[in-house]
Each structure stands twice: as C-alpha cells, then as structure tokens.
Amino acid sequence: MAKESYKRDKPHVNIGTIGHVDHGKTTLTAAITSVLSKKGFAESRAFGDIDKAPEERERGITISTAHVEYQTEKRHYAHIDCPGHADYIKNMITGAAQMDGAILVVAGTDGPMPQTREHILLARQVNVPALVVFLNKVDIADPELLELVEMELRELLTEYGFPGDDIPIIKGSALKALEGDPEGEKAILELMDAVDNYIPEPVRDVDKPFLMPVEDVFSISGRGTVGTGRIERGRIKINEEVEIVGIKDTRKSVVTGIEMFQKLLDEGQAGDNAGLLLRGVDKTELERGMVIAKPGTIKPHTKFKAEVYILKKEEGGRHTPFFTNYRPQFYFRTTDVTGAVTLPEGVEMVMPGDNLSVDVELIAPIAMDEGLRFAIREGGRTVGAGSVTKISE
C-alpha cells in the first residue's frame, strides 16, 4: 500500500505527556487517540502498544520513547510518551523529542508527587514553552481533596516560573474515556481544546535567523573558501552578509555562492545540506565547530550553567563518580571542546545515573544560546548529555 503523503494543511505541534509514575500518562495518551479516532482524527492506539516503546539513540544515549500522532480541528500533533522516569529525564535533557508544549498528568488521588516536581523543573530548565494540566482519576478522588490538589499544583507551577494562575487544569478520568464513558470522553475533548488554544504555535525553523554549523571546509582555487554543513535554521541567499562565530574571534563575510548536491542554488534553507562560498575568508580561518550565522544573532561563550544527565555504567557511561574540576569534552553540534565542571554547593560528587545542574567553563568559545544541547564525552565515548540553561559569560 502506498504511503499517504503528509498534508501540510494544519500547523504542526510537538507535545508530550509528563508527570509522576502511575499517574496515567500512557492511559491518557491512549485515551486521546481513542476519543479523536471517533472523529476520524487519529488511529486508536492501545495502552500496551504505547507502553512497549521502542528504543532510540540520541547523542549516544539509548532512550525509550513512544510516538503517536493525531489531529484536532485546528492542528496536527506529534505526541511522545516515555515508559520510564529515567527516559523522561534523558529525553528532556537531550532534546530527543523536542516539545513545543506538554500535558502534565497528575492523579487527583495523590496530588503532586516528587516526579511531578522534577518534571516541572526540567520543563522549565529545558524551555518547554507551555504546560496544560490534566487532573486524572477524578472519578475515584475525594472532591474536597481535588480542590486542594488544584491549589497546590498552581502554587507549584508558579514556584518553578510557569504562570500557575493561568494554566488550564482539566479534570477527568483517562481510564473512563478509554472505556468509552461519555463524561470521560468529554474531558478529553476539553483537554484537547485547552492544548489547541493555550499551547502557542511554534516558530518554524525556516522563519528563525539563519545558522549553519560548519562540518567541513575546503578551498576552491581562485574563488575562496567553502564551509559545508546542514542548515539548522533560517534561510540564506547569495550576497547576504554573515558572521563566522566560535572558537576564534567573530568575523564577517559575504556568501558569494550556495551549492547543494553539486548544483548551484539562489537560496538555502533549514534542513538543506549546503556548501557556502565565503568571500575573503582563508581556509585556515574556518574550521569544524564554528557556525555561520546571520550577523548579531548568536555570540560565542565559554561559561554557562547546564542541566546534565550522567550515564549509568550499564548505559556505557563511567564506572566511577566524578568531582568538581572534572574535565571532559563537550560536544556541541559538530565538535568537541574541553571544559571544566564545577558542582553546585553541597554536592561532593556525581554518580553515574545522576542528573543535576552544573557550571561549565570551556577552553574555547562556542556559539551558543540558552537551550543548546550537547553531549559529554571522554575520548570519543559519550558519558552524559546536557542542555545549556543559562549563559554566564
């Protein structure tokens, strides 16, 4: 059977379910597909089907993630659900599944639990733009308790920098919805309505300022130097001015040619593998790890705060803990740069399998923004992953 072509008639949004273990994330994911399938907007996916999530590798780390897709009247959604708590942490820190928004699932019978808190904090740290709350299991919870849970949740969200008073909290039962109960189904439609209206539509990569990480460099005699790589965001046209950022001092140039698969183009855009011919740039002035970007849109930095996950021994990580002044390589986009790690006050050492916030100082500057992902490596072997949460210098 021929594959159905992907129709771009609705805006596309990536979302996911987050929250404490056994609060009903996977049941809710199954319920959403079940309820929307009745409107012809989804293929119903059974709980067991989603729960057996396939393993994927992202930045050298194995993560189990289930992907489902569905539509509403307004949008097309790609939805991720992770079976295990560690998978969520790895997913959010590596950006394996970039989330434009998330549904925080909280059981009305329990209220916020430790992982609820941890997932909200992580969502804040890795810049998930918006959350919507689904208060689950309300059919078996005490109504007075539900009011308290809602208040507690709003306070918790505010504490972590989300607009706790404004976030939609939808009450329902994912299990009832999955069983076809009309009240249960109504809550799911209400939830999707909140997701449609409250989670903002993401800016598409092509509409962001131009940036291309340099993967390879070669010179064309008599014409100049070419940097090749995959355009990460934005568009580039011939004769546009660019900046070369990272490792060495930032310098300006002009793109005098754009090539893709040996063909000349007038314009390159996000997702293209392209070669850019740069005016007046010597081959020695361009190297892997630099980025070519729209002037003034990104700066090189050496010091930053990051949220990191350190691999367990079983995941191919370190066998021993590390301490302040640990000096691994940080792999950003296309290259490794050595850096020193400073642990937060009160943390003596970091064990394989931990996730925490650290300060890093690199020996050479790298073009970075908050939210940039990286791998932590020792001699080419991945031992962790991280996300830049704040630039210090």
Curated annotation (Swiss-Prot):
GO cellular component: cytosol
UniProt-listed Pfam families: GTP_EFTU (PF00009), GTP_EFTU_D2 (PF03144), GTP_EFTU_D3 (PF03143)
UniProt region (G5), positions on chain: 173-175
Annotated region described as G1, given as residue ranges: 19-26
EC numbers: 3.6.5.3
Catalytic reactions on record: GTP + H2O = GDP + phosphate + H(+)
Top-level taxon of origin: Bacteria
Coiled coil: none
Residues that hold GTP according to the record: 19-26, 81-85, 136-139
Xref: NCBIfam families: EF-Tu, PRK00049.1, PRK12735.1, PRK12736.1, small_GTP
Protein name (record): Elongation factor Tu
Species, as recorded: Chlorobium luteolum (strain DSM 273 / BCRC 81028 / 2530) (Pelodictyon luteolum)
Gene that this sequence comes from: tuf
